[in-house]
Amino acid sequence: MKYELKTTSGNARRGRLTFSRPKGEYVVETPAFMPVGTYGTVKGMTPEEVAATGAQILLGNTFHLWLRPGQEVMKSHGDLHGFMQWHGPILTDSGGFQVFSLGKLRKIKEEGVTFQNPISGEKIFLSPEKSMEIQYDLGSDIVMIFDECTPYPATFDYAKNSMEMSLRWAKRSRDRFDELQNPRALFGIVQGGTYEELRKISAEGLVDIGFDGYAVGGLAVGEPKEEMHRILEFTTPLLPQDKPRYLMGVGKPEDLVEGVRRGIDMFDCVMPTRNARNGHLFVSNGIVKIRNAKYKTDTTPLDPECDCYTCKNYTKAYLYHLDKCGEILGARLNTIHNLRYYQRLMAQIRQAIEEDRFDDFVVEFYAKIGKEVPPLQSEVNK
């Protein structure tokens, strides 16, 4: 993987990732949003439909694919690309967040994590080394180190111990990745909770080990938005300028804008797909809740500014009808629209950075959705 930083507008960065894959070179324009394909599918969508929304890279879930269908099935198809028939780049998370999500079902030790398989109930063990081996078999283009996602709230001592263990796990991940002679990219993950001092130690420790890119983890786990913005604004300047920066598990459209304002290049979130299935649809001026009875007879498209298949062909009344009847097509059309909304937003962001008018774009974006522009920490401190 090669990263090229092309231009900036304030702290916003316009870049390009290039991946060499068996079917040729693949380019990902950044800032980029990655749809989530937890079980080897973006729910309800074919790979061709996902690509048609403008997505250039997907996220797969190491933990879930390891449990089902397992490494052997994956290897029998070549890798995850062959299994799901997506031939562009794939980033896989390490399983750390899923382990964090299991709560009482897991036990964390220095060696790794023992937990109860949520499918079969048996005890299984996941370590930094095992995570690197699974991701190698998945053929991931971007491999994530195995870490502990520090919960919120966490005391300073808990966050410190968790971050220090994640740093040791980062080194073990790096070593096993190199032993496997994996030709792909490996990203480190900054932890440290909401404590700037710990974030600094984590970022510096990861840079010392050396990675192809750096993620900011442990955010969007329940902390107030202001806290997320503060930690993000503090952390990104600590990361190398010439490497991509990834904000994990974020988020709402305004979260993407705020991440880019603070120097982030990559995002992923289940929000556009999950919200689509629940009738929450993102449009240029906010959100349409398609289950509202006022749309029952609405003959207008979802978003007149949108060029997706759904908006070009169907009315709100039809989408309301499909949702009311529980038709699968409704969820699919909603998903197509929400994913396209996110990709259009990223394209608009990239263009604004190229034209060095990103600050103006931010003002216009918030004006459209009827919200105030959140201040940057640097502005608050003046």
UniProtKB/Swiss-Prot annotation:
The protein's Enzyme Commission number: 2.4.2.29
Q: Which cofactor does it need?
A: Zn(2+)
User: Mind telling me which Pfam families this protein's record contains?
Assistant: TGT (PF01702)
Note the SUPFAM superfamilies from the entry: tRNA-guanine transglycosylase
Renumbered to this chain, region (RNA binding) spans 249-255, 273-277
User: Function, please?
Assistant: Catalyzes the base-exchange of a guanine (G) residue with the queuine precursor 7-aminomethyl-7-deazaguanine (PreQ1) at position 34 (anticodon wobble position) in tRNAs with GU(N) anticodons (tRNA-Asp, -Asn, -His and -Tyr). Catalysis occurs through a double-displacement mechanism. The nucleophile active site attacks the C1' of nucleotide 34 to detach the guanine base from the RNA, forming a covalent enzyme-RNA intermediate. The proton acceptor active site deprotonates the incoming PreQ1, allowing a nucleophilic attack on the C1' of the ribose to form the product.
Task: Relate the assembly described in the record.
Answer: Homodimer. Within each dimer, one monomer is responsible for RNA recognition and catalysis, while the other monomer binds to the replacement base PreQ1.
The protein's name: Queuine tRNA-ribosyltransferase
Q: Which gene is annotated as encoding this protein in its UniProt record?
A: tgt
